[in-house]
Amino acid sequence: MSARYLVVATKEELYLPIAKKERNRIPIVTGVGGTNVIKALRDLPRDADILNVGYCGSPCFPVGEVICVQYTKLLHPGVHFKEDIFELRGSSSGVTCLTSGDFVTDPHGIPPNSIVDMELAYIAAFGFEKTSAVKYVSDNLNLNEYETCLKK
């Protein structure tokens, strides 16, 4: 049986309700963004069972909504080439998590039924096939909303 990990970007995300329920998983705090994910997870076996819990933004869902993610891919606004889409385990929600290298504040180009984060597609692209994800909508692609959410 492969090891089970709870992967979050920040220590604060360890206190989200779903994360608190996952005490049987080994916690890994990666830091925010793709480069930090790569550094933190590069030595894990690719058959590791990963649950990614964290914050996301979305123009499609209300702040406070809890989302089980079915798909993830990189977000490259203005780039028109085919991106790999990764299907995650444990969800049939139809929700896609778009992973960006920057905080996204413009909802233009964000498809319906989508959320935006800064880590998930990197985890999936790294070859971790036993990955599932639960995201908390912290903002509607608004930096002030996000910062207010973190203060709660």
Label each residue range with its predicted role.
Residues M1-L6:
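Extreme N-terminal starter segment of soluble prokaryotic enzymes
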Residues V7-E12:
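Gly/serine-rich nucleotide phosphate-binding loop at the start of the catalytic core
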Residues E13-K152:
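Glycine-rich phosphate- or other oxyanion-binding loops that anchor nucleotides, phosphorylated ligands
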